[in-house]
Amino acid sequence: AAEMYFGSLENRKILVIGATGKIGQIMMKNIAADHHVQLYAASRQLKSGEKAVLGTDTLSDGHGTRHQQTEEYVQIAYADRYRLANEMDVIISATASPHYTLTKEGWQSGVIQKRRRILIDMAVPMDIEAGIEDEENSLCHLDELTSLSEKNQHLRFEAADRAREMLERDT
């Protein structure tokens, strides 16, 4: 969703709220592995300003050479999430919290910099309160992502069918 919104995530600043949880960790690893971004993690367990290592993976380049890839991110305290939101291009919230991690009131008082950004809510129940979205801020919920995924899967199946038909015609 964020790539569709911006076209590319290269050099974007991305904040993951709930980064120490299961979904948050998966999101962090996937983002770090696929994109050259500045990654930030907010959680109630994290302290601000510390750099941390997401993990080290051994990668093969297909020619027998193996490389170590270490992904770093900056930890921020949960209480600093609105202040840091001013600098972010993408904010992903993936917590098991029963309350909102981003509220309309907190957003209006803490996020003063107007800029184009996308907020992605991966939680059930929702983490991000409706009403934050406006001309600059787009809000995408888990149900929208599911629908988008299903559409993309359908398009891939159609493309595979067309390719299969072309191969059958040519053989």
Model-derived features with residue positions:
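Adenosine-phosphate binding glycine-rich loop
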Residues: 108-118, 122-171
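Short acidic low-complexity segments
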Residues: 67, 71-88
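Glycine-rich adenosine-cofactor-binding loop
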Residues: 2-32
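Rossmann-like NAD(P)-binding element
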Residues: 81-104, 112, 116-120, 124-125
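NAD(P)-binding Rossmann-fold cofactor-contacting core
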Residues: 25, 34-59, 64
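Cofactor-binding loop segments of dinucleotide-utilizing enzymes, especially the Rossmann-like FAD-
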Residues: 19, 44, 122
